[in-house]
Swiss-Prot record:
It catalyses: 5-methylsulfanyl-2,3-dioxopentyl phosphate + H2O = 1,2-dihydroxy-5-(methylsulfanyl)pent-1-en-3-one + phosphate. Gene3D superfamilies: 1.10.720.60, HAD superfamily/HAD-like. HAMAP family: Salvage_MtnC. This is Enolase-phosphatase E1. Binds 1 Mg(2+) ion per subunit. Its cofactor is Mg(2+). Its EC number is 3.1.3.77. It is an enzyme of class 3 (hydrolase). GO terms for biological process: L-methionine salvage from methylthioadenosine. Monomer.
Length: 249
């Protein structure tokens, strides 16, 4: 195949949006207080809690300032203030790297005790294994933390798929709607951008990837919030990705 790299989004691309919105996010929100409280005394050694605290201190939004004032006036403890702030970020769906890191640690607990099992699209496991056998380099770029990405594929209902991927990228690499992020990824893959196919359910992300020189495919699945592919090629199943790759040979 001419294109040797597949860069895959997760939510709405290899995994149904509803699994993330109806299972993963509610679990993380439910367990957030427990996790922060249990690890509060370890915060000098917890990079994720320190990062979340710094983000809160730097946030000058009205909601953030209200919670800070409650702490200053001794209405609530610092730990409760941070928990309230993080729940606020969840409620407004902010793409916070610190929050994503914490969610990954909480999901690790859920996957580890068997409460969570990843639900992928029916064809995902078969396609991933097929692409891997064909010699394609498979990589992930998701707003979820790398830890969360690996957990999702390690604990899928279709078995452990983690080893099929060679590279993992999250928002530590850069925002997904910035072309510079995709340029960085191409460099880390040691590949020309035009040798990389990026598959995502978000048209703005596809636009940014194409600006960086990548090929793009827009994943249009049931339940995906973004229904506008702009002028990107549309796939309704990962099997269609395989067909397009064959057509490019």
């Amino acid at each position: 195949m001419n294109q040797q790299h597949l860069l895959l989004d997760i939510e709405g691309t290899t995994c149904p949006v509803r699994f993330v919105s109806d299972t993963l996010f509610p679990f993380a929100k439910k367990e957030l207080s427990r996790y922060i409280t249990q690890n509060w005394d370890k915060r000098p050694h917890s990079k994720s809690i320190r990062a979340a605290w710094k983000e809160w201190m730097d946030d000058q939004s009205a909601e953030s300032m209200i919670i800070k004032q409650q702490v200053t006036q001794c209405e609530i403890e610092e730990v409760e203030g941070l928990i309230q702030y993080l729940k606020h970020l969840i409620s407004i769906d902010r793409k916070s790297t610190a929050l994503k890191d914490l969610q990954g640690k909480i999901w690790e607990y859920g996957y580890g005790n068997g409460e969570l099992k990843s639900q992928l699209f029916p064809e995902t496991a078969v396609c991933l294994r097929q692409w891997h056998e064909q010699g394609l380099t498979l990589s992930v770029y998701s707003s979820g933390s790398i830890q969360a990405q690996k957990l999702l594929y390690r604990h899928s209902l279709n078995g452990n798929l983690e080893d099929l991927f060679s590279h993992w990228f999250d928002t530590h690499t850069g925002p997904k709607k910035s072309a510079e992020s995709y340029t960085t990824i191409a460099k880390q893959l040691q590949s020309s951008p035009n040798k990389i196919w990026f598959v995502s359910d978000n048209g703005d992300e596809c636009n940014s990837a194409r600006l960086a020189g990548m090929h793009t495919l827009f994943s249009l699945r049931e339940g995906n919030p973004d229904r506008d592919p702009r002028d990107h090629k549309v796939v309704h199943s990962l099997r269609e990705v395989s067909a397009l790759l064959i057509a490019e040979q």
